[in-house]
Amino acid sequence: MSDIIQDTKARMSKSIDNLSRELANISAGRANSNLLSGVTVDYYGAPTPVQQLASINVPEARLLVISPYDKSSVADIEKAIYAANLGVNPTSDGEVIRITVPALTEERRKELVKNVKKIGEDAKVSIRNIRRDINDQLKKDEKNGDITEDDLRSQTEDVQKATDNSIKEIDQLVEDKEKDIMSV
């Protein structure tokens, strides 16, 4: 298999990995340490991810407990969680921070599903852009005489197969996340 096809699959795989990460950050009404993955704390002047400053535990389905390694950073972590606008209210006793994840209303679930579909659509656009870039490169190579017309046709078909598989995988990820969100 040519380097171009390998490159195509690698780039498409990265897009799917990004989608998976984004979907993991969307809360389905259950506590999940990924909820805080995008939260950075201004710690001694440097933006630092919460995961590096504290251990994050999920003792119950709707409860996150954040135990900072440095107790003096509790207020900073709490402030960063508020600033991240996650739709949760952290409470602190000076030692640990507790976040109770609210149950999702039907309206909020539909809003999240809409957001999931948009993220999935963005991922599909990314995949199609990769396909277009690769096909343009293949046509350029054929025009320059680097590959034959038959090679162009077969590699274009391979790129299309990779695109179809990637879009199928994206659809499956989005569908699974929708089911997760809509299950009460």
UniProtKB/Swiss-Prot annotation:
Entry GO CC: cytoplasm
Xref: CDD domains: RRF
One Pfam family named in its UniProt record: RRF
GO biological processes: translational termination
Compartments, record wording: Cytoplasm
Swiss-Prot/TrEMBL keywords: Cytoplasm, Protein biosynthesis
Gene3D superfamilies for this protein: 3.30.1360.40, Ribosome-recycling factor (1.10.132.20)
Keyword Magnesium: no
The keyword Oxidoreductase appears for this protein: no
Main location: cytoplasm
Region annotated Disordered, chain positions: 141-164
Record-level Gene Ontology MF annotations: ribosomal large subunit binding
SUPFAM superfamilies: Ribosome recycling factor, RRF
PANTHER family, per the entry: MITOCHONDRIAL RIBOSOME RECYCLING FACTOR PSEUDO 1, RIBOSOME RECYCLING FACTOR
Family: Belongs to the RRF family.
Function per UniProt: Responsible for the release of ribosomes from messenger RNA at the termination of protein biosynthesis. May increase the efficiency of translation by recycling ribosomes from one round of translation to another.
Protein name, entry field: Ribosome-recycling factor
Species per Swiss-Prot/TrEMBL record: Staphylococcus haemolyticus (strain JCSC1435)
Organism lineage: Bacteria, Bacillati, Bacillota, Bacilli, Bacillales
Name of the encoding gene: frr
